[in-house]
């Protein structure tokens, strides 16, 4: 999990400089090589090191996906597409243990890595053939052909040369070639700098806390149902389904609600949707349109729902009420927590539109560190305070830190102007 948090920090800023496509290729090659090594490994040390390498290759692709989404999707539609991009990372940890157990039982554990390597190889093959470069620093809105062969798909290389030459000459494209993809210009600490920038930093901190709470619940869930209801291993596994279903529903459906609220506020402000579709954070400020308000109006109620359902889960579990009640609370928490988390992901991309991969890498770093911390401390807290009071304290912390994002909602203009004046 440490490498899952650290590697995207460097890969994100690199993709903002040299493009998404070459970094994607590097990540897939790294991931495939690690899986092949894991399948052939015979020592624990080798397994440990190769798992770190595997995490380095796989975790960075999540941030690249958010970067590609920011490249090709406008702010008016960003909610639904970022939601779709998050489905894979959400479903993976839920289905992975189940599928891994089946593969191990019938084929052996080595075949897990063989299948992963084969699947990644197929994706790499399709990526090399079809996936175009999307980084706007290099290709603008897609009309500027990239100069490097690494940034061109095989399909584009076989197109007629006349069209490519016309575009490459820069005619009718005043911003053609405005950015050069020089790896030496990459700042590996760019993602870390984002952590100290307003208004990104409070959003990332709040998002990391939301993820840590989610991780604390899921990591303690097996113990809770086994200790309070004496569930066996099969029933403990089934108890993850409600929170997983709620999470998936939020990931798939919440983006449409976020986009609807964006259009509603744009129309209310008298901004034509064709203009509003391309607004970034600063453009919205000049037009009197608050992009963060469009996102937070959905996120804040979702946090309230998540807090209430978390309290319901903890106290009904402590009182040992029928298990259907805490399971229903888990379903609601899965929806509320994921809805809030996805809204904040969209807002992070909105604020850092030109460097989305670096910003999401910073978000990933905080998310993984706080998530690991949440998973580490939750069981000692439950042993000392009990289920009910532990999650009551966590809900209270979540509510106390909510002003971090409400501060953005109500005092955004004043603080932003103060920062601009000081600069």
UniProtKB/Swiss-Prot annotation:
Q: Which residues are glycosylated?
A: 141, 151, 352
Chief location bin: membrane
Signal sequence coordinates: none
- Known uses: Phomoidrides A and B (also known as CP-225,917 and CP-263,114) are potent inhibitors of Ras farnesyltransferase and squalene synthase. CP-225,917 and CP-263,114 inhibit Ras farnesyl transferase from rat brain with IC(50) values of 6 uM and 20 uoM, respectively. CP-225,917 inhibits squalene synthase with an IC(50) value of 43 uM and CP-263,114 with an IC(50) of 160 uM.
Give the organism the record lists.
Fungal sp. (strain ATCC 74256)
Q: How does it sit in the membrane?
A: Multi-pass membrane protein
- Membrane-spanning ranges: 25-45, 82-102, 111-131, 203-223, 238-258, 298-318, 321-341, 369-389, 390-410
Transmembrane helix recorded as keyword: yes
One annotated GO molecular function is: transmembrane transporter activity
Listed InterPro entries: MFS, MFS_dom, MFS_trans_sf
Q: Does the keyword Transmembrane apply?
A: yes
Q: Which UniProt keywords apply?
A: Glycoprotein, Membrane, Transmembrane, Transmembrane helix, Transport
Task: Read off the Gene3D superfamilies from this record.
Answer: MFS general substrate transporter like domains
Subcellular compartments: Membrane
Q: What does this protein do?
A: MFS-type transporter; part of the gene cluster that mediates the biosynthesis of the antihypercholesterolemic agents phomoidrides which are dimeric anhydrides.
Tell me which Pfam families the record gives: MFS_1
The gene it comes from is phiL
Return the similarity comment.
Belongs to the major facilitator superfamily. CAR1 family.
Q: Per the record, GO CC terms?
A: plasma membrane
Q: What is this protein called?
A: MFS-type transporter phiL
From the UniProt entry, list the residue stretches annotated as the region Disordered.
166-185
């Amino acid at each position: 999990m440490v490498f899952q948090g650290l590697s995207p920090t460097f890969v994100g800023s690199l993709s903002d400089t040299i493009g998404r496509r070459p970094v994607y290729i590097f990540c897939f090659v790294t991931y495939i090589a690690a899986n092949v090594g894991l399948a052939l490994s015979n020592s624990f040390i080798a397994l440990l090191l190769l798992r770190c390498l595997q995490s380095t290759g796989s975790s960075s692709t999540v941030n690249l996906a958010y970067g590609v989404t920011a490249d090709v999707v406008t702010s008016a539609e960003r909610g639904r597409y970022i939601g779709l991009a998050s489905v894979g990372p959400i479903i993976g940890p839920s289905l992975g243990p189940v599928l891994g157990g089946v593969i191990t039982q019938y084929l052996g554990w080595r075949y897990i890595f063989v299948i992963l390597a084969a699947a990644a190889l197929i994706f790499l093959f399709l990526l090399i053939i079809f996936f175009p470069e999307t980084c706007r620093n290099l290709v603008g809105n897609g009309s500027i052909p990239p100069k490097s062969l690494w940034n061109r798909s095989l399909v584009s290389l076989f197109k007629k040369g006349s069209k490519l030459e016309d575009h490459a000459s820069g005619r009718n494209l005043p911003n053609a070639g405005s950015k050069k993809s020089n790896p030496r210009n990459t700042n590996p600490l760019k993602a870390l700098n984002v952590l100290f920038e307003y208004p990104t930093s409070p959003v990332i901190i709040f998002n990391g806390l939301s993820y840590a709470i989610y991780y604390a619940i899921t990591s303690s869930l097996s113990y809770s149902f086994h200790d309070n209801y004496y569930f066996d291993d099969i029933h403990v596994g089934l108890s993850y389904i409600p929170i997983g279903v709620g999470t998936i529903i939020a990931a798939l459906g919440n983006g449409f609600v976020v986009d609807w609220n964006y259009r509603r506020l744009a129309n209310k402000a008298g901004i034509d949707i064709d203009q509003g579709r391309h607004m970034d954070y600063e453009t919205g400020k000049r037009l009197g349109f608050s992009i963060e308000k469009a996102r937070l109006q959905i996120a804040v109620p979702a946090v309230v729902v998540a807090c209430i359902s978390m309290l319901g889960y903890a106290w009904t579990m402590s009182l040992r009420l029928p298990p259907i009640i805490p399971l229903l609370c888990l379903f609601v928490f899965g929806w509320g927590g994921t809805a809030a988390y996805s809204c904040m992901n969209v807002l992070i991309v909105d604020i850092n539109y030109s460097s989305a991969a670096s910003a999401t890498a910073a978000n990933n770093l905080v998310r993984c560190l706080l998530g690991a911390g949440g998973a580490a401390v939750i069981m000692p807290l439950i042993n000392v305070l009990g289920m009910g009071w532990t999650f009551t304290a966590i809900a209270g912390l979540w509510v106390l830190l909510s002003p971090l994002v409400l501060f953005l909602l109500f005092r955004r203009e004043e603080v932003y102007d103060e920062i601009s004046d000081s600069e």
